[in-house]
Each structure stands twice: as structure tokens, then as C-alpha cells.
Amino acid sequence: MARAGSCGGAAAGAGRPEPWELSLEEVLKAYEQPLNEEQAWAVCFQGCRGLRGSPGRRLRDTGDLLLRGDGSVGAREPEAAEPATMVVPLASSEAQTVQSLGFAIYRALDWGLDESEERELSPQLERLIDLMANNDSEDSGCGAADEGYGGPEEEEEAEGVPRSVRTFAQAMRLCAARLTDPRGAQAHYQAVCRALFVETLELRAFLARVREAKEMLQKLREDEPHLETPRAELDSLGHTDWARLWVQLMRELRRGVKLKKVQEQEFNPLPTEFQLTPFEMLMQDIRARNYKLRKVMVDGDIPPRVKKDAHELILDFIRSRPPLKQVSERRLRPLPPKQRSLHEKILEEIKQERRLRPVRGEGWAARGFGSLPCILNACSGDAKSTSCINLSVTDAGGSAQRPRPRVLLKAPTLAEMEEMNTSEEEESPCGEVTLKRDRSFSEHDLAQLRSEVASGLQSATHPPGGTEPPRPRAGSAHVWRPGSRDQGTCPASVSDPSHPLLSNRGSSGDRPEASMTPDAKHLWLEFSHPVESLALTVEEVMDVRRVLVKAEMEKFLQNKELFSSLKKGKICCCCRAKFPLFSWPPSCLFCKRAVCTSCSIKMKMPSKKFGHIPVYTLGFESPQRVSAAKTAPIQRRDIFQSLQGPQWQSVEEAFPHIYSHGCVLKDVCSECTSFVADVVRSSRKSVDVLNTTPRRSRQTQSLYIPNTRTLDFK
């Protein structure tokens, strides 16, 4: 069994773990005062309960009684006993052990008093100690008496007041008899011993902190020389005073301080409660809110703010407000008109249909309709390659007028209209006018127009009698009049004053139909509209080129290795040169295939979307590596040398309104370069021809194109 330190507060001050048992002498030295009566009753009861198992144990002094943390009391082992202050004969019976326990409790009650002083005890406690300490005299007196006579002793024992206490059971019975409920004596006295043990440890820890604080203050003094004070002097400095104050504080906390008045309960004669320490009792009351706050008086009265709780104040405020109207009686104000944002206005304008320009009069209805807005191909001797159709010439051989069917065309986009308006505003009255085709007019629409015109020509041979054709709408169909440089190569319908159509325009609103020659019908049936002859955009050329490249790639399907290399971009699409492993070759803009630097050329185009760039505005940078690429094929060198002219490099000057936002350079392979160059040449020639068309024929645009009366092919 471990021993506790002999010096009070040494364990707590030295930082060692708290002991789990203390001797009665250590408790007395810590408090510097004797035990109270309640603690004496508890030590007697718990001591008898702990010593029942060893009746021959000898208690020589208060140091032999040990108090444990659970409230039990035991005796110290004989071999660990210290030198006794009073010599006691060896105990050989339970009666002598009870007697030694009585002497120890008496010394604990009389500890610290002078010999001349005597402590006043309660009659019950004084009688118990007297019976325990004088049991040997009672024993000897009983032996001298007559053995056969035991009447008075039996009478006293029958009355419940024994003449001597010789056993532990008798002492425990007397300790329990003083309580109102003797059955709870064990729990009560165990709680008292536990409280005594815990309070002693707290007092020792408090005294250790006081001693450390004093030592700290002495070290902080700089004006006085540092003098080493003996440890005993520091320990004894104010020890008694601090211990007395501690005991008074514990007594006040246990008896006098109450946060809330306890309701009346059953009468309990116990003066104090020892189940918990004062600190534990205070914390338990705070947690359980067993307290009642005093009301604060202001001018002799409680303020109105604290008369009611918050919930009642809120309800009073709600009741004080005017009553709410019923839902059926409420009328909400109309919402103010919401102002539309600029974004919403723009979206509404986009969703609305385009407004057509009104027809100015019947004089405009009598005008002829020009040719379709298509692009002329390079003029050749074959009439099949001609793509310009003159729709303004009347049929001279027609004897009667016939109705002209109308074809619905798609309206141009907003971007196209802006480009056309911008180009018309920047032109001078005498300068050439750059025309742009309606990109929404596709080949399917042209084929449909061709079929309707052909059907109209067939029905014109037997026109109904007396029928008058409907008046045509003035629109954007242009009358094409070629210049002097194109008259020998390109077909045209020249406005002649002697022409019957032109002579009858000013006099009558009807336009007689002209007869169609068999050659014209034959040429119209064999009319073709090649891709390169259209004023395509870059996006349309890219789509066409991708379809052609996809068809060209099908011939490499038999050679899977070559097909895979071309598809994955491991070799050049033109010269079939293999690229290095960690290289990043450029890709062609049109066919999206990898191309080497010797087979590519830089193409110049405006900084716009591909769908808004006409193909005739493209240009090429002069290749600097034509002379260095000696291994290049002759056909590729010819392509590069054919792009040396100034017409490919001065596109910014030729089309300033399109290149106003700058230009970009794109890589194009040699195969796509030859394809695009042919398309650009054809488009530029057609644009040059369309520039000679008078401006008055392009004043307005119509979504309807009437059927032609004469098709002139040469």
C-alpha cells in the first residue's frame, strides 16, 4: 500500500500525481486544527468497518489510520509503521483494537490544543469515546462480580445503552443510532470521509500555489538583494492563517451560501451535506439553475421592461398594431411598366421580319429584270460553260403574252445586307460598283428556277387568248451590260434603241414576248452551274474541298499503311515526306491534312468569319522557298511561280472595305492552292464583268424573280 507524503502540499507543489490515500495525521497537519464532530463520527464508523477483517491490528497513533479517496478508512501495515508517540501494548483482541481506535479519534479531536485546554464535545460523541477507551475497566469489573448475577447489565443492554463498547459492531451501531435513518449510515459516513479527503487535497494544492506565488514575488524584487530563505520558513509562513481561512470558506460555502431557497422538505436533522464538496455543490446548482435572481428596483418599482418576458412583449406589440385587412378586400397596385433593356430591344428587332422596300410606281413595274446574281466563268468557246443568264430580253417570236411564274428566293442575312449597304455608300457615282451574290441562292434554287423557266417556255408555245400577264415586281434582278473588253468573249444582251422591247417600254406597260430560237432552248437545257463559277465564300469552298479530299482518300484504302499515315498526319499530303517523331507540322486550312513547309504556302484573308469572306478577296504571300526547294515537283513549282503576280499580294488595296479589320495568314497545301486559285480567278473575272452593270438596276432588291421571256446564249 502506497504511503502519502508527510508534508502537507508537497505532492501538489512538486507536480507529482495526487495520492490516493492520506493518513489522519497528514489531514490534521494540513488544516492545523482538530477534526469536527461529524468527521469524528465518520472516521469512527468507517474505521470500525475497515478493521473488522483484522481485529488484531494495533493503532498506535493517528498516523496509523489511512483515509482513501473512495471514503473508506483502513490501518497501516505493521512493517510500515512509524515510531509511535505513545507506547501501547500489543493488541491481541478486538476489544483492544476498538480501544486503540477510540484513543486515536480522541487525539484527533484534541489535536493542536494545549494541555490546559479542553474541548467541549456533544454528549453522544463523548459517551462513545468514553465507552471505547474504558472497555478494559468495564471488563475487569465484570470479572470481579458474581458470575451468576447479571441482572443490571442485562437491563441496561435491554434498554439500548450498553455499558461498554468492546466490538466493532457495537461501535457502528452507536454511530448509526444518532442518524434519523440508521440504514443510510454507511453512505452518509462514507461521503463525509470522501469529502474530508478531497478537501484536504484541494487545501494542499491551494497552499502550494500560495507558496509558489510568494517565491515568484521574491525573485521579482530588484531593489533588494536576493537572500535565500529556508524552505521551512516559506512553508510555515502564514500556513496556519491560510488553513483557518480555508476552513471558514468551506464552512460558509457548505452552510451559509445558497443561490436559491430550497423548498420545504422532510425534516432532516443532519446539519450539513457531505455527499459532494462545496465546489461540486455550487457547480451542480449552477448547472441545474437552482437559483433565483433578485428583482432590481428602480425608484421603488420594478421597471416595465422586466415585468413581462419577450414573448408577451412581442404579442403586445402585435395587438397594438391596426388590424389587418382580409385577403378579399386587398387591392394591389398595378405594376409599373417595365422598361425594356437594350438587349431585349435588339432581340425583338432580330425576331421581326425584314421590311421590304415599297414599289415606287408603275414605271418601275415596266422595267426589265436583269440576269441572276451569279458569277461568270472564264469565257471560253464552249457555250456549255456559260453561267450568266440574261432575263431582261423579251421573246420576239411570242405572238401572245403568257403569265410569268414567280420564284420565291431566300432573304439575305443581316451581315450580307450590311456589307452591301456599306459598299454602296463608299462608292462614287462614277466609279465601279462591286456586287456580291446572294449567298442564300443555292444550286438547288437555281435548278428549281431552271425547271420552272423550261416549263414556262413549253407553255408559251400555246398561250391562252386574251390573257394579260401579271405585272412584275421591281426588284434586285440586274440587267447585265458588258464593257468593251468583254464583248468578244462573253454573251450579253445590249440595250439597243431599235430593239422592240426598249422601244415599247416608254409607251405601254405591256412588254411583248420575243420568240426563242432552237439554239437557245438547246443551250438552256444543257445549262450547267459549276462550283468555281459561283461567287462562293471561303466556308463554302472549304466544304467543297473537304468532300473532294474525302473522295480522293478513298483510292488509298487498298494501301492501309499509307491511308493510316495520311489520316493521322504522319506524312505530308503532297510529297508524302515523313515527319519527325516529335514534330508538329502545320495543317492545311481547306483539307485539314498535315503538310510540310516546302509544300505549303501562306494564304492572306480578312479577319472575319469564313462565312462572310468572299472567295475573290483571297490573296497569297510570295513564297521565298521556291528556289530552295529543288526536289519539289515541276507542277508544284509552277503553282508557286504562278502566284508571284501583284494581283495576289495587293488584295488589301483592291478590297479595302473588307480588309478594314486586318488580315491573317493561313497555311494551304499545294493541291488546295491550285484549286482555290482557279476559283479565285474565275470569281474575279465575274466580278469585273458585274462591275460594269449600271447602278440604277441595283437600286432595290426583290424576293421574287419573274420568269424570263428570252434566253440569249452565244
Swiss-Prot record:
GO terms for biological process: actin cytoskeleton organization; actin filament network formation; actin nucleation; cleavage furrow formation; establishment of meiotic spindle localization; formin-nucleated actin cable assembly; Golgi vesicle transport; intracellular transport. GO terms for molecular function: actin binding; microtubule binding. Disulfide bonds: none annotated. Acts as an actin nucleation factor, remains associated with the slow-growing pointed end of the new filament. Involved in intracellular vesicle transport along actin fibers, providing a novel link between actin cytoskeleton dynamics and intracellular transport. Required for asymmetric spindle positioning and asymmetric cell division during meiosis. Required for normal formation of the cleavage furrow and for polar body extrusion during female germ cell meiosis. Binds to actin monomers via the WH2 domain. The Spir-box targets binding to intracellular membrane structures. It holds the Pfam family KIND. Residues 136-162, 453-516 are annotated as: Disordered. Keywords: Actin-binding, Cell membrane, Cytoplasm, Cytoplasmic vesicle, Cytoskeleton, Membrane, Phosphoprotein, Protein transport, Repeat, Transport. Residues 486-496 have a biased composition (Polar residues). Its main location: cytoplasm. One of its GO terms (cellular component) is cytoplasmic vesicle membrane. It comes from Homo sapiens (Human). It is a peripheral membrane protein. Residues 534-554 are annotated as: Spir-box. InterPro entries: KIND_dom, Spire, Znf_FYVE_PHD. The modification Phosphoserine is found at residues 371, 440, 442, 476. Residues 22-203 form the KIND domain. CDD domains: FYVE_SPIR2 (cd15768), WH2_Spire1-2_r3 (cd22186), WH2_Spire2_r2 (cd22079), WH2_Spire2_r4 (cd22081), WH2_Spire_1-2_r1 (cd22065). Residues 248-262, 278-296, 342-359 form the WH2 domain. This is Protein spire homolog 2. Belongs to the spire family. It is found in: Cytoplasm, Cytoskeleton; Cytoplasm, Cytosol; Cell membrane; Cytoplasmic vesicle membrane. PANTHER family: PROTEIN SPIRE HOMOLOG 2, SPIRE.
